[in-house]
Amino acid sequence: MRLTLGKGATAVYRARAGVSVSSPLYRRHGVRNVQIKAAPLGEPTIVNGVNLPISSTPSSASSADAKFHVVGTPYSMLSVSLSASQNLYTQRGTLVGLSGKADNVISTLSVLEPSRRAIVGIPFLYQKISSPSPIKALVSVRSPVTSFAVVHLDGTVDWMVAQRRALLAWTGHSLKIKPRINTNLSVTNWGSSEVTGRGLLALVGRGQVYSVELKAGEQYIAHPSNIVAYTLSSTRPQPYRFKSTTLRFQIPGLQIPELLLKSRYVRDLTASDTWKASMKLIHNFRTWARRTIWGDRLFLQFNGPATLLIQSRGARVRDIMSDKEVNEIADTPTGATLDAINKLEARTSPSTNENDKIDYQRAAEEAVSQAPGPSRTVEGLTQEIKGVSQTIATIRDGKVEFEKLKQQNAEIARK
């Protein structure tokens, strides 16, 4: 960094150095340049992979027969340089322009495993471009919020393209791309492609694409919608759920007319066991479907060494939280709500009984104190009431049974 001294600082410097204004040294060097360098800070130590280096992806990759170069800020177009007799596969409708001998260029529509790719939603229509002479092509996409990332495969490390439409173009005679289904994830994240061999890949992601490098022993948790691609190692990424990933929203309920609520038929229907069992079954099925099929709360855990390509815009708001997710957050099973209310009433009932007992005790004391005649206590009055209402005999099936005889028979049986 270059620092220019002001007049005051220059005068102080001249006074200390003994240089006058008329000195030829001063006339030759009217301003003194001072080089100031900041002291280098220590690099942050990586503790259990907390401070992971996140960097932008390389803008170019080259092999012996081709070269991929990303142009634009942000990366918005791919420049492909092909040698003679080299094949380029790109998604249909993404070729922008081409330079070279156009008469030698051969373009055909290739259908790549439609039966396997169509099931999981991976594009299977690609445009194959080849020429006996060197050519240069420009490839782009229609979406305005995408960027490119290029990957060079040397045959030592295989890659897995996690997003369905992330694979834009590739070249390489030994490069093989096979669709894969990861049954550990939800259906929305089943469309993956395994890439093996040697060649160049051009991937496209929403927003910006960044690279995360994991060393041996490091771990990283990422959402499947943000993972563009990753390297394959001995330890495959495993599904991961956080201990608490639920969001609680308060959504106002429906204003059901009171006349309908007071209907005897509706009350009997909602109070029946069949209704409760059916509602519980439907709620369990909906919860299972939301967690298993859509699975927006499911993450992936990666173990190093590995390289991840992450896109900044994983999904739209509608994809992140659909109507089904909102219903899952807002809905609660009717049986569970009623059980909670019953439990709350059961918890509060003992305190209510105690309050009633206290009020009864106070009222009884006031009544006894104000009653005419000899003064009596509340306990004595209670004993008198019990004595008056004491039962001596009961009639069962036309027979009279005395309580004293029952007590005597019970004592004899004990002895």
From Swiss-Prot:
Keywords: Mitochondrion, Transit peptide. Its main location: mitochondrion. It is found in: Mitochondrion. GO terms for biological process: inner mitochondrial membrane organization. GO terms for cellular component: mitochondrial inner membrane. The keyword Transmembrane does not apply. Residues 1-33 form a transit peptide. It comes from the Eukaryota. Belongs to the AIM24 family. This is Altered inheritance of mitochondria protein 24, mitochondrial. It comes from Talaromyces stipitatus (strain ATCC 10500 / CBS 375.48 / QM 6759 / NRRL 1006).
